[in-house]
Amino acid sequence: MMVIEETFAIVGAGKVGTAVGIALKEAGLRVQALYDIDHRALREAADLFGVEASRSPADAAKSADAIIITTPDDMVEKVCEEVALSKFDIAGKIFIHMSGALTLEALLPAARKGAKTLCIHPIQTFADKKTAARMLKGSVFGITASDESSTNWARNFVEKIGGKSLQIRNEDRVLYHIAAVIASNFLVMIEHAAVSVFEKIGVKRDDALEALIPLVRQTVDNIQRFGVVRALTGPLARGDVGTIKAHLDSLENEPELKTLYRAVSKWGLNIARERGELEITSIDKMARLL
């Protein structure tokens, strides 16, 4: 592992910025400066990292070798441009954004001034600041860089803070982010739908979650052990047309749930075909029903 000697500035003291700052500190790397538009979040993070709160993104960036931007996506390019248009020289500095969907183009203002630019995105979900730092270790980071030297630096950086690297082409970052959204955010939406069905039959939300969480955990465990094809169970995996019809009939007065059920089940047919255990006629019957 190469030695990382750079000092860091973090612009954005939310969940991701705080987690990264803690990870840097635990790795023995120096957080030199910090900025956030939210003064309360800025003060809390500044106290946590033992640094003075900067007055602006440019003020934070001028004293560091590497600038990590962890703002909301629509602010990344604005922050980068503000720093790039400031009076001090940024040539040779490293600009990193941690957005999943944005490409290197969001950092073009800095690249035009001679800075190196990187996308380093943690494939992880951060529900709150308290657990965010712990979740970074062992996570995979989607990295994108414009040259081999920057790619090597990104890999080394990720390894230093306890993560693993997955190289993503710049033009593929939106699709890459879609995959992460489906895996994490869609899971929450699906479970919300499942809980809402329980509530319709009089089961309280807490009781519904108590019943469903073990099922969800075992399903994820099955995916890890057997893969996304072998892990599928239930009526669609069995070719149980009668049960699927009964489900759809029961959702006749619930158009949104019925649309969701059909859409997800249609994708499940792809799994059934790939699995190759059902007769084609059985899959065709389910396809017509859906």
Which positions does each model-derived feature cover?
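Interdomain hinge/lid region at the active-site interface
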Residues: 221-278
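Short beta->alpha hinge that forms the Motif I/post-I loop of the SAM-binding pocket
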Residues: 37-38, 71, 171
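NAD(P)+-binding Rossmann beta1-loop-alpha1 motif at the extreme N-terminus of oxidoreductases
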Residues: 1-62
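Rossmann-like NAD(P)(H) cofactor-binding subdomain of soluble oxidoreductases
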Residues: 55-131
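Internal alpha-helical scaffold of NAD(P)-dependent oxidoreductase catalytic cores
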Residues: 30, 44-45, 131-225, 279
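NAD(P)-dependent dehydrogenase/reductase Rossmann-like domain
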Residues: 272-290
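Hydrophobic Val/Ile/Leu positions in short beta-strands of Rossmann-like dinucleotide-binding domains
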Residues: 9-10, 69, 143
